[in-house]
């Protein structure tokens, strides 16, 4: 007996976006076929179109305003350039731990800027025909959006790693850990910087009010990024991230099992975590804001300027004792 299965699979995202022009509604490939006779022609027609995206209709001006609104929510963090970079020459002399911490502050803000750019690109629901030809439909544009969103997720997750490193180095918290050795290379010390080790230090310093204040700053950010961190973990270490609508639903599932009916394996077990691209954007925006707030609070808590020194009239350096301004004293 022979069995023949026929299945036509089309990704849902092909229907996500339509253009309304001169009273008619078009998919992108249909619009391209109907009106493109020369390069850049479709871009010139776009301002005269209404956009229907996943059932919501907007004018082109309304769409542009929505892009500006997202940009305005994604503040730029400039703590390093505004208040720390000018101190670096002094920090190398007065408090090298603060200097190392400041360099990771620089990394955190650069990482945040990268995440911001990818998020803004991922939030754009349409791309110009000259960049991604409309003749191929909406799938290539949506696919590019998901790549940008996944990249943003990973960068935001990396930002939190740098936030931990800022505090870890400023206060020499690695000295609290059993795995720390005095002859460790700097790279090995950085490997000790993890959220789980911060949790151990928090338990060890449960009566340290200054550390409790630092922990609140970090934990607030960690809570705000909880979903983003889960997504990033899938992207880096598990089955990846899959986006609803990007691929057609698989028409078959394969089960392999014993004669008694026990299932050994099935295809669905290899699927990535599934996200709705448009629903994860507000979560990423909130995560961005939480990181900005965390960096600002962290810089205020560390107080880099207090490590600055003075030079008296005889040319002698007056370097403040670390115990007078460093809020969390390192274990010796």
Language model features: what each stretch is:
Residues 2-110, 114, 137-147, 165-332:
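Acidic, Ser/Thr/Gly/Pro-rich intrinsically disordered interaction regions
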Residues 108, 115-118, 122-125, 145, ...:
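Small-residue hotspots
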Residues 119-122, 126, 163, 170, ...:
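Leucine-rich amphipathic alpha-helices with coiled-coil/heptad-repeat character
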Residues 127-136:
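Active-site-adjacent bridging/hinge elements
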Residues 154-169:
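Hydrophobic, aromatic-enriched interface-forming segments
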